[in-house]
A protein has these predicted regions:
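Soluble non-cytosolic domains of exported or imported proteins
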Residues: 34-38
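N-terminal secretory signal peptides that target proteins for export/translocation
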Residues: 1-6
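Short, conserved active-site entrance elements at the starts or edges of catalytic domains
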Residues: 125-160, 181-186
Length: 265
């Protein structure tokens, strides 16, 4: 049961590319003015390949390994334009935890808590994180960004940006001073076992078909400890549409959530 509680938190906080025990240092005093948040976002877009490269693709698949507290398994992350996602973590001897968004319905399944249709802030976050061209088009979710300090994350100098969403949530993103790329985030997610403030760290960017992709994702939270996702496969434009279909276990629950669903087509 404890294992699946941790997996519930992992699944709830995953859908990005985030607490106690995070490697953040105290803010570093600046001798110069902080760059505007919009400029940091623009620099990130260029640093990962540019708008044209991002918009040249319509889907992506990542595959690799997952490790947490002596437990290991496999992970696959599927995403597609304009806003679809599916994440599945399989652990031998325990089973598979899955989460998805088909452009309208957000859902997750695990062996302990069963199938669930997402609503409210959980659905809003999943919609935002499923935006395939993120950060392009993020204005539909974000009402403001502000650079608040120069600090450190994962032994890197980063600019800390406070983000406010249209549903009045505030969270932080961190942009690498040297490379310009997104280095991580801190955000609170709602899980089946309560809220979890989660630090996400992005490492090991590699160029794939003109786009730079982080191949290592580290997540830390007080509730779930540390999880490390290492991807060995990254490919664009090879994902079948059927991957994003709502599972049979979820369909009976969809009627109760349709009033909060939104289409991105």
């Amino acid at each position: 049961m404890k294992m699946w509680k941790r997996m519930s938190i992992i699944l709830a906080t995953w859908t990005t590319a985030t607490v106690a025990g995070s490697p953040l240092a105290q803010g570093i005093a600046l001798a110069q003015e902080l760059p505007p948040a919009a400029a940091l976002v623009d620099r990130h877009v260029e640093a990962v390949g540019g708008r044209a490269a991002l918009e040249s693709h319509i889907s992506r698949r990542l595959a690799g390994s997952f490790e947490t507290q002596g437990i290991s398994g496999t992970v696959e992350v599927f995403s597609a334009a304009p806003a679809k996602s599916r994440i599945q973590v399989q652990i031998p001897g325990f089973g598979t935890v899955i989460s998805g968004y088909d452009g309208r319905i957000g859902w997750r399944i695990n062996p302990t808590f069963g199938p669930e249709v997402l609503e409210g802030r959980s659905l809003d976050q999943l919609k935002q994180n499923s935006n395939f061209y993120n950060p392009l088009g993020s204005e539909r979710f974000v009402v403001s960004r502000e650079t608040v300090e120069l600090t450190e994350l994962d032994e890197r100098s980063v600019y800390k940006v406070e983000v406010t969403t249209r549903w009045d949530e505030e969270y932080f993103k961190f942009y690498d001073v040297e490379t310009g790329r997104l280095a991580g985030s801190i955000r609170t997610y709602t899980t089946p076992v309560g809220e979890a403030e989660t630090t996400t760290i992005l490492r090991d960017y590699e160029e794939v078909d003109g786009v730079w992709v982080p191949m290592t994702w580290v997540q830390r939270s007080a509730a779930a400890g540390e999880q490390v996702f290492k991807f060995t496969t990254a490919e664009f434009d090879q994902v079948e549409e059927s991957v994003f279909e709502v599972p049979a276990e979820i369909k009976p629950l969809v009627k109760t959530a349709e009033s909060s669903a939104e289409t991105y087509d």
